[in-house]
Amino acid sequence: VIAHLKGREKLLEHIGFPRQQGEWVTLVCLHSGLFTRDQLAFYLQGANRFYVRRCVKALLDCRVSSRLIADERVIDGRLICRIFGKQISEVLEIPHTRHRRETSLEVIRRRLLSLDFVLDHLELPWLPTEQEKVSCFEQLGIERDLLPRRIYAGRAKGLIHYFPLKTPVAVGPEAAVFVYVDPGMGTRTELDSWGEAHRRLWEKLRESGRRVEVVAVAWEQKLLDRAGRRLRSWVASEMSDNEKEALMLRQAIAETDFDTIESYGGFDAVVEMILRWDRKSPVPKDRGSIDSFRLWGSHRCRRIGDRLTK
């Protein structure tokens, strides 16, 4: 059972999808709208190509309300299957505009890489839809104004979409994971722009006691190396045990956590302890904007002939 699907896959049983195929279609509709046969084979735990071919054919032949819901074509040198049917989104009770429209090569690459990372980390508490992300952060007391967003002009003038790149976000009780996907077609400043759009959200999450981790995902080693050089400058300086304890005690005072305060000898003793540690460490540590980062290279989506470091 994949927890973040929230049982949506069961809604596909009545149109002929068995459990595992229903989970796959739901994953794709939530995270990317398209996939490669290599990704499907990985999800099916190394199934042979004939079984994968049958699964794809079943999807391509499937009709909902007498209409086809998927197609397959060669894009970017790969055979890519796209689920576009509005009807399947309605069955799954997710916004039908999420991933079904045809789009640019850059967005296609970003979506495939996003799905690939999620497939390797299905255990994380993913927030796959815009509404789930917004609701989660609002429940944590974080206002919408602090979330990354895009305000649209033209016919959709005034429409606001939060987390407009639709890259994966997972939030648990102790840590939050934000995935940055580099499709290899942008500029060197895009990572900085993405980070700036998330900065205030990350500040609030860290103030609440959650660690913030950024994962940079790409299909070329040079893109991972470039992201790594930049992300190192975002990470908070390592604190000593005393500094960590002082930070914990400051939070206890701010939150009027009397149990913790009393366990350290009362309010006066806690204040004196904090002041003593501050005198020993007069130079404040750089808190950075995130607590840690990882680099993740996609072997299933890598550029043909490009080697990725394990």
Where are these regions (language model features)?
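Glycine-rich, often proline-containing surface loops adjacent to acidic residues and nearby aromatics
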Residues: L34-R37, S89-R100, P173-Y180, R211-E213
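Catalytic cores of nucleic-acid endonucleases
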Residues: V181-M239
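Non-catalytic C-terminal interaction segments of nucleic acid-processing enzymes
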Residues: K222-K310
